Amino acid sequence: MAAQGVGPGPGSAAPPGLEAARQKLALRRKKVLSTEEMELYELAQAAGGGIDPDVFKILVDLLKLNVAPLAVFQMLKSMCAGQRLASEPQDPAAVSLPTSSVPETRGRDKGSAALGGVLALAERSNHEGSSQRMPRQPSATRLPKGGGPGKSPTQGST
């Protein structure tokens, strides 16, 4: 174990490329993420999102279980807001603001901004976007496709 002590430790200021390579190596050793998940994690890292691999794995698992990405995002946003409230005093009126818009996360600390970026990426890639669907029109307001009952163009003389 003395050989691992050589070089910069986790507390020192290592270049971002070295830190990313170190995280990648640790992930491969732990086998936390599958190959596809690793590719998605690397894309998130390349986009500037600094997120713990274990947290990323939890997010991916939630999305695989068809949990709505918006629900995951709002939960994480409220958790991050709770951490900020505990660490720094804020105006109580700021806590009651609605948490529905994604761009609010851009000015926050690195961790929550990274989570917001990953979740925004996941929201865009989710094909089921149930929160963005328009409600169906009731069938009573639709016109019948044929001219009327029994007047189908496919009916002919027999």
Swiss-Prot record:
Its main location: cytoplasm. The modification Phosphoserine is found at S34, S152. Residues 112-122 have a biased composition (Low complexity). Residues 128-140 have a biased composition (Polar residues). InterPro entries: MOZART2 (IPR024332). It is found in: Cytoplasm, Cytoskeleton, Microtubule organizing center, Centrosome; Cytoplasm, Cytoskeleton, Spindle. Pfam families: MOZART2. The keyword Membrane does not apply. Keywords: Cytoplasm, Cytoskeleton, Phosphoprotein. Residues 84-158 are annotated as: Disordered. One of its GO terms (cellular component) is centrosome. The keyword Cytoplasm applies. PANTHER family: MITOTIC-SPINDLE ORGANIZING PROTEIN 2A, MITOTIC-SPINDLE ORGANIZING PROTEIN 2A-RELATED. Associates with the gamma-tubulin ring complex (gTuRC) consisting of TUBGCP2, TUBGCP3, TUBGCP4, TUBGCP5 and TUBGCP6 and gamma-tubulin TUBG1 or TUBG2; within the complex, interacts with TUBGCP2; the interaction plays a role in gTuRC activation. Belongs to the MOZART2 family. Required for the recruitment and the assembly of the gamma-tubulin ring complex (gTuRC) at the centrosome. The gTuRC regulates the minus-end nucleation of alpha-beta tubulin heterodimers that grow into microtubule protafilaments, a critical step in centrosome duplication and spindle formation. This is Mitotic-spindle organizing protein 2A.
